[in-house]
Amino acid sequence: FLLKVAYNGWIKDHCVTLEQFTSLVYDLTGVTVENQLKMPGGMDAVLFLAEPDHLFDPKLWSAVKVSGKNDGASEFTIDADYFAQNALTNCELINLEDMLQNGTIMNGVMIEKPHRFITACTIATQIILAVTSSTYGGATVSLAHLAPFVRSSYEKYYKKYKENGLSKEQCEKFAKEDTKKEVADGVQTFNYQVNSMTNTNGQAPFLSVCMYLGETDEYKEELAMIIEEFLNQRILGFKNEKGVYITPAFPKLLYVLEEDNIHENSKYWYLTELAAKCTAKRMVPDYISEKIMKQMKVDANGDGQCYPCMGCRSFLTPYIDPVTKKPKYYGRFNQGVVTINLVDVALSSGKDLKKFWKIYDERLELCHKALQVRHERLAKATSDIAPILWQHGAFARLPKGASIH
């Protein structure tokens, strides 16, 4: 059905037979269907799939023109054409810790736990590419999930020098030097990969990187090393085609202000100074106050929580995993966004405040219905539609064919 809709909407105009088009869509994963049903054919599919009659109303689509009408009432964000693919979620916090520590599967190949920092960086970027190719929003990863592999690298170097008969002091000195060099190489690899690879959305992954010392106690020193290197490399910038250093678009940086780094006499004050220097030159990182966030994000246990925003800059709501009874943020996502055009509501009210709120309530209800349609579409999917998300750790580890609802 979807293939015929897409074919009738656009493919036919390009002199491709239905049989030829169907033969292209041999793999019914979300990624493959996504690329075959993108605008404008996917738009026709959306109108067939948005079953409730009120969602056929062109007022719902301010971002796209339906029936030649676009009055800007509300917006089915980000792209309505993605709605035709029922398993595509929007933004997420990738559970990089689980995927690196317990392994994952990509393209049918088992990727086991890495044993060096630079290897972990390479695998992380491949995970980011796979995940962002199976979604349509922004993603965030935490550098705390990479920190344990810095220690793994240090231990390997230390063991090498010890086996060569060096003293403890020499082993520590040379192992630290080698580890620092590997951290620099790993961060450079990460940055180059993120900026040079293209996902199935036809763009570099819309990625944010979280720098939160409070996420780990055991590997805080290693995390500080990674944060320092990320900031130094961002200050330097990337060379463009003319060899001039410029500000790279991605990854975005998220720096958390906490007791360990906000006072001049605190241990990690030097990182905050470096972050400020980076902001002055490159307009990143963005800053999150641990103190204020813990006041605003209180979970069901009564505990304040601090965690990064998703790539889209929106924050998940506090949540307690019913199985572990612990807060859960990584491996969560949002299902999609619908936006009210407040300017249009104001203009439509004719300066009548009561009419403004009446129109506002109507538009808000329409947005809620649109969100419910997104939820219902997603709830029908199985884990097979995006294995990297649902089967191999980015969101969950469900069996094949299991419902994601």
Residue map of PLM features:
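A domain-level signal for the structural core that forms small-molecule/cofactor-binding pockets
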Residues: 4
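Conserved catalytic cores of very large enzyme subunits
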Residues: 7-405
